[in-house]
Structure formats: structure tokens, C-alpha cells
């Protein structure tokens, strides 16, 4: 049987091929983060959790259709526990609901989880409007689809097999539907378990840095489209409905949403190429402070939603019981919480089961007291539990990009030189970004580029610290404050943060991307630590664009997504600056023309001191390795 990762990879590759042949809000980061020198917040430890199954079998009922307010019908598959001969139990049960765009009739990522069902849960998968075998037009988390979420919740809570307590579960697409549902606090919605969820659809992935993601977005649109054209077995009993849905989904893809949205982004459409209401309404961080439903967030250090996962927790924690678990995962790995159990953390299914057992079944199992924050720490190569995110003892330190290629906490001298970078549109392909921003798919192919950034660094300028004399702990967002100019009319700027081992291997920890003309920042929505801006909030609107003149020197603030790492004693910290992160970032056509054939200069003198602001935690705040690990 194919595992979840295999199902996702196969689906993406098949649908990408089909696509290529067939198709010719405000964030919670707007605040000042202050340091807490006491570090008094309690840090809890993980406890094991297992519960024996209650039922030996399960059964999936015949497909049902849920009629929406406008007559559109959504396809639903319901799986219930069963007795030894396959009869569904008659006792009403708590329900685990998943609303998906990946066709609930295909199995794989949309198959019921026996672990939950056999422990006394009904599990329901619903194809959102215009996807799978549901009728209607898909609009990817738009207002109409969001209204459907609540109607589905109403329907599920009232069914005879439901006891009215509903939890939501699932990765990626199936995680964003949870967060968008939870902002309405439906009375039946008692808990959610959001695995690798998007938070800000524009800034996270689709247009990070003002450039469209060419590694993931086209393949993802193709995946949803391709899976929407696969009929459920039951559909052959109603050929008229089958053909109607097939025609509707095809027209939707070509003329109404998928193709038009992608083309609009590439051509610079005001609605999709900029951070408009189109994106804000689809981004859970816009209204994350409204959520009162207990929420468990799972993220990945190399996930495509790396930026927003800790920010979602941050926006939730003051209004509900929220937990955060971040692993060393790309999107595919994080979708299945790969590698657990480890370091005292239970298996992913056991964590979710404990969460639902407490909030849906009322079991006094201590789930509410799980560790608030659990993070994997690069360099330590282990998970640790921490009191909060951002860490209560967070400080900021500024390191300067020196003219001699060094990285130092000492400011630049007046006569220090500058460095140049050729603006090549395909630079970055030999870096870990290619694996990360393809959701981990391209990372399955063997390449030396993913574990060592030195090949890619030949196309960038690098600034490297002296070997660390003591372990150096960073945890949080990073900001690069650069002074640049270009001989072209615009520039793409990528900044990478790497750990350089004594043998010279350069391991990329995280990165950030920005189109220079999109450099306008709203200081009121940006994050500050100890007086330093550490996470800029770029406006990304058409009106806020700041065109460059040839050879004009400008200051830009590049947002580098959060990471957690210890640069070990004897290792060095490296910042590299380049002009492209292909295929993660592809500028809209007109921006690309403005950037071609340019030479970008990075300045390092006292009047134009390029630097990075790092999120530093005292190494003493890092929990020690537990005995026996």
C-alpha cells in the first residue's frame, strides 16, 4: 500500500504532467517583542499516550451529498467503527471532520485513519466546492467556500451517528480549512489539529518577497485540478451528474480560477500579484485572534509554510489553549509527522488522539498540559520543549556584512569595499530552497545541492563569521538590512543563513526573498526586539511600489523566515546574498524584464552598513539533553 508521502508525490507528478500538456491579512507580527530576563514561564515535558482500540473494524458508508444554501451539493464520505461482521455502530460518536480539495474518493491523503475510527470516532471527509466529486466552482478558500465550511459543520453535528462534538484534522489544504472554520467558533467545533497549515497565503508561499512561487504553485493547482477530474466509483451510477461535474470542473480550471489566477500573477494583475483583499480573506492570520477553539499546530523548519506556523500559535495562545510542534520537516515530511516518536515525543497519531480524547470525549488525560512549544533545533539535532514562542528570553543582535567578506558584530569602517552579484534569473536552483519550496518533492531526487550550499554560493556573495567560541542559539525570525544598487531597473534579492562546519560544509538554515521595488515596509505591523526591527511587514501593494533608478543606492529590509538552530562551538555563521532563488521565486513578467542583465552591488561601508538582525536566546535557556538520549 502506498504511504501518504508516496500518494502525494505521485499525485503531484501526475497532475503536473497533465497540466503541462493540457494548459497552453494583517498578521499577528505587528508588535514589539520584549525580553523576559527571568525566563519564568513553565516548560513542561511530554508524557506518553496510548489507548487500546475499542472496535476491531470500520466501514465507509455510501457516499452522501450535502446540499448547500444555493443548491450546490458537496460530496461526503463517512467512516464509522464497525463490529466483527462489518455493521456500523449505532451509538452516536464524536466526529473528526476533514474538508479537502484532494478528492475524498481517491484514498491516500484523504483516507479515513483506522487509528482514530477504531478508538471510537466517526471520520468524515468532504470535498470542498468545485473539487473532487462536489459540484460548483472552486475558488480556493474564498468567501463562498468558507460559508460552506459552517454549513458542513451544521450538517455533521446533526447526523444520527454524531454526538454533536466535532474536531477537525488534516495537513496542508486540510489544515487551512480548519483555521478558516475556527475563526467563526461554531458551537460544535471543539478542537482542531492543524498540520503544516498556511497562515498568510500571499507572504508564505504564493508571492513571498513579491515573486510567484514557480516550484509549488503550478504543480499544486494541477494537483487539485487533476484530482477533481477523477470520478468516484459511485458516480458511474449517475452518468448525468458525473458528466456535469466533469464539465464544470474543467471550465473552472481553464476559464474561471486556476489558469486565470496563475496568469494574473505572472502578468502583474493588481488582484493577484499584490496583497489585495483576494489574499487577505484566504489567510487565517488575518483573523487568527478570533479563534477560541483549542488548536494544535504542527509546522516544519523546511515547510512551505515555515513563516506562518509559529505566528499562528502566537496569534492563538492568548485566546485559547494552543500548542506548537515544529520538526525538521519539509511539507511532505511534516504532513505525516515523520520520525516520531523520538526524544520523548509520542507518535503523531497518539498526540492527535490525546487532543481529541480530551476535547471531544472529555477524558482527563492531561492533553491541555502538553508542552506549549516543541521545536527541533538544528545543530543540536534534537527536539526540545520551550516555554513559549517567541522565547521569553529573546534578544536581538546585529551582525555586519563586512567589506572583506567577514561577518562581525563590529560596525564597518568608512573605507570598506562593496561586492557585486550578477542578476541571473536561474540562480538558486542548486540550493536547499529547491527541495523546500517544491514541498519536498524535488528533494527526493539525489543532489549534493541540498546538504551543502557551496556550489550555489559561487553565484552569490558570502559573509562568514569567525568560528564560534561558544555555542550560539538563534530562534525566531531574522531580518537583513541591506544597502544595494543595480545597473538594471529592479533587483531580486535572496539572503541565506547557513551554518558552516569546520570541514567547510555550508548548511542552509533558512532564507528570505525580496523584490527591491517591493521594499516598502509598514513599521507599525513589523516586529521589534530590543529596539531592532527583526521581522519587517512589507505592504506588497501596487500603490506602495518604489521603482529603482539605475545605480540608485537604496536600503531594503529582507524578511528571513524563522528558524531554530545552535551554531556549535567551532562552527561559523554565514550570510550569503544573491539575486535569484529559482524556482522558489519568479518575478512577474514586467518585473523580470526590469531585472535582467543587471549587476547588483551590496555595500558595506560605514555610511551604508549592510547587516542582519538575529534572534538570540541565551544558550543556558536550551534544555539539556535528557539522560539516556
Task: List where the protein language model places each region.
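Active-site-adjacent alpha-helix of alpha/beta-hydrolase-fold enzymes
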Residues: 307-322
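N-terminal cap/lid segment of alpha/beta-hydrolase-fold proteins
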Residues: 48-91, 464, 468-470
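C-terminal motif of bacterial Sec signal peptides marking the signal peptidase cleavage site
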Residues: 19-22
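Short beta-strand/loop motif that positions the catalytic acidic residue
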Residues: 291, 297-299
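Cap/lid segment of the alpha/beta-hydrolase catalytic domain
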Residues: 85-158, 206-208, 336-340, 501-502, ...
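Alpha/beta-hydrolase fold nucleophile elbow
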Residues: 160-173
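C-terminal, loop-rich substrate-recognition/catalytic regions characterized by aromatic stacking residues
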Residues: 341-629
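Accessory cap/linker subdomain of secreted extracellular hydrolases
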Residues: 118, 182-290
